[in-house]
């Protein structure tokens, strides 16, 4: 008779564990993951952090209304770009997300911005992580 409650508890724990392993990690969206070849792209301006100022100008015009500015980060509309979830991504992945957007998350595509300015924007996003 004592074995039944222990067995039921063990089965319940196993079921919870199995269900947890099937859930995607919080904060990730598998439908918005940069393809490997795009994620592997290197920022041609990575060795020129002074170009982040150009990215800041682009950010002020196109991104700050949702993502906030350097003093007032992330609004309720969009994630904090200085946060770990964004900063852990490769430059290529960030560039791909800027370029392609995500309509499911109300992130517009900024592929119309010239490529050099999008790479400068990636530099600026990186600088936001440095300020934490």
Task: Please give the residue ranges for each predicted region.
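Electrostatic cytochrome c docking/interface patches
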Residues: 24-58
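Gly/Gly-Pro-rich "capping" loops immediately C-terminal to redox-active cysteine motifs
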Residues: 45, 49, 54-56, 68-99
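The canonical Cys-X-X-Cys-His
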Residues: 55, 59-69, 121-125
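Sec/Tat signal peptide C-region and signal peptidase I cleavage site
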Residues: 16-20
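Axial heme c-ligation environment in periplasmic c-type cytochrome domains
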Residues: 21-27, 45, 74-82, 99-132
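Bacterial N-terminal signal peptides
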Residues: 6-15
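Positively charged n-region of N-terminal signal peptides that target proteins for export
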Residues: 1-4
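Processing junctions and N-termini across compartments
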Residues: 14, 57-60, 101
């Amino acid at each position: 008779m004592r074995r039944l409650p222990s067995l039921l508890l063990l089965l319940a724990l196993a079921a919870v564990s199995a269900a947890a392993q099937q859930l995607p990690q919080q904060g990730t969206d598998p439908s918005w993951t940069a393809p490997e070849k795009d994620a592997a792209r290197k920022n041609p301006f990575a060795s020129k952090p002074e170009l982040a100022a150009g990215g800041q100008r682009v950010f002020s015009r196109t991104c700050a209304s949702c993502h906030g500015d350097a003093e007032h980060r992330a609004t309720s509309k969009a994630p904090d770009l200085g946060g770990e979830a964004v900063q852990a991504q490769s430059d290529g992945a960030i560039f791909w997300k800027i370029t392609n957007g995500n309509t499911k998350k109300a992130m517009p595509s900024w592929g119309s911005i010239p490529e050099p300015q999008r790479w400068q924007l990636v530099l600026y996003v990186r600088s936001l992580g440095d300020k934490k």
